[in-house]
From Swiss-Prot:
Top-level EC class as recorded in UniProt: hydrolase
Keywords for the protein's UniProt record, in alphabetical order: Cytoplasm, Developmental protein, Differentiation, Hydrolase, Membrane, Neurogenesis, Protein phosphatase, Transmembrane, Transmembrane helix
Protein name: CTD nuclear envelope phosphatase 1
Topology relative to the membrane: Single-pass membrane protein
A GO biological process held by the record: nervous system development
Length: 244
């Protein structure tokens, strides 16, 4: 069957239009991500009243343990583009590490508002990174998030976890002996199964640019630092933990 020049021209135009539309969508996604990630966000840290200052002086400074993957960031490596990451979404940074003598690139996406979150909570808590990832990767991610601020100096990795039935369990006693002062923020309930009364659950994050989960936690974290024992409050959140 002969193809007429008109038909060939129409198909060429349709193919060009499809590519153009894909490019426009890519630019729009990138612009929306930039606007949301870097928009001005405020959480007013008001001066403490004399009563609040007195209360804070009577309790120990708390420790906030932070998970990395799907809590503060999401990443994928060479050749593995997870369906949760929208095609064309640019990473916030790229890490180059060597694993088992093989160079690997990780494309890392930061959860919306993570920089602002770290800036605020570092004024209230001693921050600790605790990830089940390998140290060579987790350390590089933590360095990027810290950005020379010195707020993520203490770090624990896979070798500090306990392996049970194929899952890595985080023992908070290696972070601090007094668990009344320790809070862990982690998207995986299985990771803190030994310490559910110390945990704040957070939804796993992969690519949603409109996510505000970190911002939503600021009022709770602000109030929690005044408690004598964080477990007296967090033990009431057990219904929010999706069991492992």
């Amino acid at each position: 069957m002969m193809r007429t020049p008109g038909l060939l021209g129409l198909r060429g135009f349709v193919a060009f239009a499809a590519k153009l539309w894909s490019f426009v969508l890519y630019l729009l996604r990138r612009q929306v991500r930039t606007i949301i990630q870097y928009q001005t966000v405020r959480y007013d840290v008001l001066p403490l009243s004399p009563a609040s200052r007195n209360r804070l002086s009577q309790v120990k400074r708390k420790v906030l343990v932070l998970d990395l993957d799907e809590t503060l960031i999401h990443s994928h490596h060479d050749g593995v583009l997870r369906p949760t990451v929208r095609p064309g979404t640019p990473p916030d940074f790229i890490l180059k590490v060597v694993i088992d003598k093989h160079p690997v690139r990780f494309f890392v996406h930061k959860r919306p508002h993570v920089d602002f979150f770290l800036e605020v909570v570092s004024q209230w808590y001693e921050l600790v990174v605790f990830t089940a990832s390998m140290e060579i990767y987790g350390s590089a991610v933590a360095d990027k998030l810290d950005n020379n601020r010195g707020v993520l100096r203490r770090r624990f990795y896979r070798q500090h976890c306990t392996l049970e039935l194929g899952s890595y369990i985080k023992d908070l006693s290696v972070v601090h002996s007094d668990l009344s002062s320790v809070v862990i923020l982690d998207n995986s309930p299985g990771a803190y199964r030994s310490h559910p009364d110390n945990a704040i659950p957070i939804k796993s994050w992969f690519s949603d640019p409109s996510d505000t989960a970190l911002l939503n936690l600021l009022p709770m974290l602000d109030a929690l630092r005044f408690t004598a024992d964080v477990r007296s409050v967090l033990s009431r959140n057990l219904h929010q933990h999706r069991l492992w």
